[in-house]
Amino acid sequence: MNQGANKTVLDRYLRLDIPDQKCQAMYIWVDGTGENLRSKTRTLNFTPKSPSELPIWNFDGSSTGQAERSNSDVYLYPVAVYRDPFRLGNNKLVLCETYKYNKKPADTNQRWKCMEVMTRAADQHPWFGMEQEYTLLDIDKHPLGWPKNGYPGPQGPYYCGVGANRVYGRDVVEAHYRACLCAGINISGENAKVMPAQWEFQVGPCEGITMGDDLWMARYLLHRVAEDFDVVVTLDPKPIPGDWNGAGMHTNFSTEAMRGPNGILEIESAIDKLSKVHEKHIKAYDPHAGKDNERRLTGHYETSSIHDFSAGVANRGASIRIPRGVAEEKTGYLEDRRPSSNADPYVVSERLVRTICLNEQ
């Protein structure tokens, strides 16, 4: 239990009435790691209905790896507003972009570039669906439910499993699912993964920039929910070395043409384009230019090799998978299985649109 935490006592205060015109707005942003999130709250005298109504704020960037101490203020520009599933009422979660003292995007602000690309490709209506895999850990960073001095049984019974000896952490998963729905995130499902204590949730279909916004906010909610259960979430793509599956962020992608009659031809064309820029995508698909994915994309445990591009129907060992139903109906989408679990969804979606929609190499 976190020191000083008492959820029963906290609930007493969360049920207190606050004036109708007051709103607690929690500003949320990606920090200097490009992976972790930070947040802080301010009181408003109105209930915002859109990001444009919210004031620009700032924070100490020297404490988040985003500025020098001698010039530490970094600006927060609100870009998306969600209902707050923790405080409820009129209270809001506010996703923000970060800008430096000179009003230029911070180094880890990947959203502005993604927004430019999505605007240019808007007439093609790019849709995304991202499958966020993650692993639950005890507070001591040991996989949740695993024996302290050993390992669970081999992989096999855990995927979509049922039972206390097969799944660990379902309370966190269910609470997160409901929190996302309450917040207004387009979450579409969840399931237990092949490795015990590993789970996945899916967000989408989302069009354009909404994909990155919803996924980052869903990640924030996951960490906050896990905090309430004294559980740690890791997005490490290979948290446990050895004969255990890694974690990815498989990304489903389509354009209006792919979803139309005989869209399989557009899908095949997209795969051909992707095959020519494999290395560029690998560098974009984790925060460390491919170093994280080197541990995961080995050609084993339902992954492709990081060094080779491949594609196939219903092939979970390929870089790009065409679902069986898509191949049969000749319309639909493709699945890019290369992105790492800790990849930035703005970077992944931007890279796909640049390659497939804008023909940039």
UniProtKB/Swiss-Prot annotation:
A GO biological process held by the record: glutamine biosynthetic process
Binding site residues for ATP: E131, E200, F201, Q202, V203, G204, P205, N252, F253, S254, R316, R321
Required co-factors: Mg(2+); Mn(2+)
Major subcellular site: cytoplasm
Residues binding L-glutamate: D243, W244, R316, R337
EC code: 6.3.1.2
UniProt domain GS catalytic: residue ranges: 110-361
Record domain GS beta-grasp: where: 23-103
GO cellular component: cytosol; endoplasmic reticulum; mitochondrion
Keywords: ATP-binding, Cytoplasm, Endoplasmic reticulum, Ligase, Magnesium, Manganese, Metal-binding, Microsome, Mitochondrion, Nucleotide-binding
Catalytic activity: L-glutamate + NH4(+) + ATP = L-glutamine + ADP + phosphate + H(+)
InterPro entries assigned to the protein according to its UniProt record, in alphabetical order: Gln_synt_N, Gln_synt_N_sf, Gln_synth/guanido_kin_cat_dom, Gln_synth_cat_dom, Gln_synth_gly_rich_site, Gln_synth_N_conserv_site, Glutamine_Synthetase
Cellular compartments annotated: Cytoplasm, Cytosol; Microsome; Mitochondrion
Molecular function GO terms recorded: ATP binding; glutamine synthetase activity; metal ion binding
Binding residues for Mn(2+) 2: E133, E200
Residues the entry annotates as binding ADP: Y333, L334, E335
PROSITE patterns in alphabetical order: GLNA_1, GLNA_ATP, GS_BETA_GRASP, GS_CATALYTIC
Chain sites annotated for binding Mn(2+) 1: E131, H250, E335
Protein family: Belongs to the glutamine synthetase family.
This protein's name: Glutamine synthetase
Organism (species): Panulirus argus
